Structures are given as structure tokens and as C-alpha cells.
């Protein structure tokens, strides 16, 4: 679910569900993110979690990135991105740690992409050595592809 100025993916999530695809959404769990599968976007599937964010309820099935799957698209929010597919988050490191885990189980056909408004994309953003790069950054006007992965 979108936080602050992040791009709201509700319409896309509705389309994913309407197409019969699996939709998993993040839940803050300690210093990490875990993912739970949702079958709808109504209140019956959500509770207010950490940081006041709507998160999937804890009785929903956990998603394991090791499970058998194909052509998975992970869409990540951010405060800012750059054309080199680097991401600036909220500062907690949740998605950096999650990306490290996801990369360990990434298969051919999987894509890890940031989603942003065009105004959130810069030529270059400051990053640290632990900041993970994405495969792509998608905005309403353009798609940037990481040439170094």
C-alpha cells in the first residue's frame, strides 16, 4: 500500500487479482518485510500495521520466495530513483534487506522493478554500498533498464 508520496498501485493490484494472478503484499516484521497473499483489496484482508500502513492481516497465507513460481514481477515503492535503477527509500532499510533475500531466489524471467512518478526520477541519487539496485524503474513516461545486472 502506498505510503506518503509513493505511487499508488491499487488499480494495478485490482487487475492482477482480476486476471487470477497471485498478489502478495509486504508486512513489516521486526526489521524485515514478509509477504502475505491477499485475495482481495477490501478491508477484510487488511489491518493497520507498523507505521500506520495498511498491511495484510496476519491470518493470511505467508508467501515464501523459495516456492515454485515463474515470471514473478516485484514492484517496489521509493522516495526517489535514478536512471541507473538505484532506489532511495524511507531510510529504514526494509526494502534493501528484502531485495538481498529476493535476489538470492530470483529466477530467469523474474523482474525487480521500482515504480515512481516521473518527478521522482533523477539523473543520479546518492547511494551507500548496501543500497540495492533494481532491474528496472518504471514511471508513467518511461522505463529505465539496469545495464549492470
Task: Give the residues covered by each predicted segment.
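N-terminal active-site beta-alpha-beta segment that forms phosphate/nucleotide-binding
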Residues: 1-69
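Short glycine-rich anion-binding loops that position phosphate/pyrophosphate groups of nucleotides
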Residues: 2-5, 79-83
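Short amphipathic alpha-helical surface micro-motifs
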Residues: 16-19, 34-36, 94-98, 117-121
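Short secondary-structure transition/capping segments
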Residues: 50, 74-81
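Surface-exposed, charge/polar-rich loops and edge strands
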Residues: 57-74, 83-87, 96-149
Amino acid at each position: 500500500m502506498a505510503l506518503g508520496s509513493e505511487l499508488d498501485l491499487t488499480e494495478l493490484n485490482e487487475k492482477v487479482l482480476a486476471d487470477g494472478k497471485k498478489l502478495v503484499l509486504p508486512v513489516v516484521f521486526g526489521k524485515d518485510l514478509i509477504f502475505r497473499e491477499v485475495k482481495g483489496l477490501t478491508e477484510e484482508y487488511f489491518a493497520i500495521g507498523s507505521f500506520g500502513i495498511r498491511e495484510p492481516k496476519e491470518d493470511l497465507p505467508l508467501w515464501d520466495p523459495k516456492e515454485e513460481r515463474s515470471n514473478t514481477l516485484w514492484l517496489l515503492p521509493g522516495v526517489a530513483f535514478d536512471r541507473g535503477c538505484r532506489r532511495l527509500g524511507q531510510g529504514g532499510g526494509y526494502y534493501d534487506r528484502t531485495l538481498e533475500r529476493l535476489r538470492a531466489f530470483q529466477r530467469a524471467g523474474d523482474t525487480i522493478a521500482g515504480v515512481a512518478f516521473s518527478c521522482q526520477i533523477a539523473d543520479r541519487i546518492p547511494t551507500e554500498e548496501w543500497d540495492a539496485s533494481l532491474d528496472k524503474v518504471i514511471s508513467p513516461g518511461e522505463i529505465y533498464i539496469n545495464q549492470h545486472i
